[in-house]
Curated annotation (Swiss-Prot):
It comes from Helicobacter pylori (strain P12). The keyword Hydrolase applies. It is a multi-pass membrane protein. This is Lipoprotein signal peptidase. The active site is at 114, 131. Belongs to the peptidase A8 family.
Amino acid sequence: MLNTTQQSLLVFIGVFFLIFGVDQAIKHAILEGFRYESLMIDIVLVFNKGVAFSLLSFLEGGLKYLQILLILGLFIFLMRQKELFKNHAIEFGMVFGAGVSNVLDRFVHGGVVDYVYYHYGFDFAIFNFADVMIDVGVGVLLLRQFFFKQKQNKIKA
């Protein structure tokens, strides 16, 4: 029988590979030439040399190593924060699966494969599925932590 830490690790691994696999499959289709255009959203191929909104693109090839260090550092931190990891294995699986997928792009393609271009009413930065999964994972984590704190405060009152 698995203990809760082992169960959380399995959930983390499963979500990690699901997000990583879906992201890489979509990127493969984009790299093979899939395109779409509409009045609101286009699917186009762009290699992002930076991070969000092309920030830090001046770091060029060094950015991927910085990201690896950040991912490894966060993973080591989480392994020491067992309760945090157990409570948020899904969210961390999403963030790590997406993050590793984007870092892999940097090694294989020289930049992150971005493709969703929203341009209805205003131009938004081009992004990908992994970016969305990072945002959703962090957003759910923050919401759950916020509501957990509120619940704890009510119990203490």
